């Protein structure tokens, strides 16, 4: 079982109405992106952290570790905005290298800060949803919102095959490592190609078996999964509305 999936099953917010969590995550994500505000992004980051770690019971160390993944990509991506090579030094910093300067501007630094804050806060919205809601509940909420059945079915199948292929991939990796299949770059490439071809063949076999199993159970184009019904509560809806209102006010006043 994947880490995020395991944490979602253990979350204290798992049995909160999935449609409420989905709408909160989507609305907060939209506000965070549209506002282009560092204050709104910081507030979203803090609120989602409190909800996920404080209310959901997700371990803080795991949450921070998950946030480090997008943070690494953000740092690498925003480096091009901050760092410039020019013959003219800019107003933020300048490192002289002969006739050239490795330099940056205050405007570039602020733009990078805004971009990182917005992107990282947007990721926390998705983490809130994925760490506190199991996949079947998310798909059920999407169906209630009249999301196309074809897309929800594809999402469920892709989700299913991640688990189907993850275990064989792990076993193949361990087997290759035991046989020194990654001792240098050439053998790593060869081992990766062999694993890819083996997984491709396995995926075809498993997909045919899965389709035969669904056909034997009167598959009509829609995949139906039993979900535990959790009624929406007025108090939870009021909290969501209050949070969104606060974010809008911070956006307008900021």
Region annotations inferred by a language model:
Residues 44-51, 137-141:
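Hydrophobic transmembrane alpha-helix segments characteristic of membrane transport
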Residues 66-182:
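Juxtamembrane/interface alpha-helical elements of multi-pass membrane proteins
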Residues 38, 59-60, 148-150:
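Membrane-helix interface segments
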Residues 1-38, 46-51, 165-254:
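Transmembrane alpha-helix interface motif
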Residues 48-57, 71-76:
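Alpha-helical transmembrane segments and their membrane-interface exit regions
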Residues 15, 35, 57, 132, ...:
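Helix-loop interface residues and adjacent transmembrane-helix termini in multi-pass membrane transporters
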Residues 21-22, 59-71, 236, 240:
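Alpha-helical transmembrane segments and their helix-start/interface "positive-inside/aromatic belt" motifs
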Residues 33-37, 62-66, 106-113, 230-232:
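Interfacial loop-to-helix junctions that mark the boundaries of transmembrane helices
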